[in-house]
Amino acid sequence: MIVIPAIDLKEGKCVRLEQGLMEKDTVFCDNPADQAREWERQGAELLHIVDLDGAFAGEPKNRASIEAIVKAIAIPTQLGGGIRDIPTIEAYLSLGIGRVILGTAAQRNPELVEEACRLFPGRIVVGIDAKNGMVAVQGWAEVTGVTAVDLAKRFEGYGVAAIIYTDIARDGMMQGPNIEATRALAEAISIPVIASGGVSSLKDIENLMAIETSGIAGAITGKAVYTGAINLAEAVALTKRGGA
């Protein structure tokens, strides 16, 4: 299991939202490329980037910042937010993004996931955001009637590289991830699961490591590494040595 720091982009800056609300944002850094370099310096093996403006608009919005991040670091990246079609996926992969995350598009158009996996094997990740176990889309603005487990099962056999599972009730609230829901999802599918939302202490990372055998491949942390609640270098060292 690896620890994956997040860079959430809004108007070209690194921000964190509370529970996905655009009006509840805190700016942590004006220069995303500098922030990416810092996470790489602290030992990150993968960087998670979200184009928040893109997620809400349904089309890419922070391309210049994303390009600057890719040029600034050597570690691989994964990017989500506003990616709804094959040309956008292709453009980002050509830019140097390692893996592209499909969220709302995956829920509304599973055929897109299937086609993208065929065209770009190993480079498509599905993001499933859920509130009380039900899938949320459109930048979390809309909760559907589909369960996270049922949606994830649809992608079995497509060749999806990973599923990022975010419990939006926990995201940005520093309350710890939803371990039980994450484990239930990981055990229901064969696709590796990356946990996200609420990872706010080394203890949370240890708790996720304890269910790693269920199929947990990583933990994304955002707010906690910006506020200092988690020291990224310490978290990376913890996962490398297999626990405390």
UniProtKB/Swiss-Prot annotation:
Domain of life per record: Bacteria
Pathways involved: Amino-acid biosynthesis; L-histidine biosynthesis; L-histidine from 5-phospho-alpha-D-ribose 1-diphosphate: step 4/9
UniProtKB keywords: Amino-acid biosynthesis, Cytoplasm, Histidine biosynthesis, Isomerase
E.C. no: 5.3.1.16
GO cellular component term of the entry, any: cytoplasm
Coiled-coil boundaries: none
Catalytic activity field: 1-(5-phospho-beta-D-ribosyl)-5-[(5-phospho-beta-D-ribosylamino)methylideneamino]imidazole-4-carboxamide = 5-[(5-phospho-1-deoxy-D-ribulos-1-ylimino)methylamino]-1-(5-phospho-beta-D-ribosyl)imidazole-4-carboxamide
InterPro entries linked to this entry: Aldolase_TIM (IPR013785), His_biosynth (IPR006062), HisA_bact_arch (IPR006063), Isoase_HisA-like (IPR044524), Isoase_HisA-like_bact (IPR023016), RibuloseP-bd_barrel (IPR011060)
First-tier enzyme category under EC: isomerase
Family to which the UniProt record says this protein belongs: Belongs to the HisA/HisF family.
Full protein name: 1-(5-phosphoribosyl)-5-[(5-phosphoribosylamino)methylideneamino] imidazole-4-carboxamide isomerase
Species: Geobacter sulfurreducens (strain ATCC 51573 / DSM 12127 / PCA)
Protein encoded by which gene: hisA
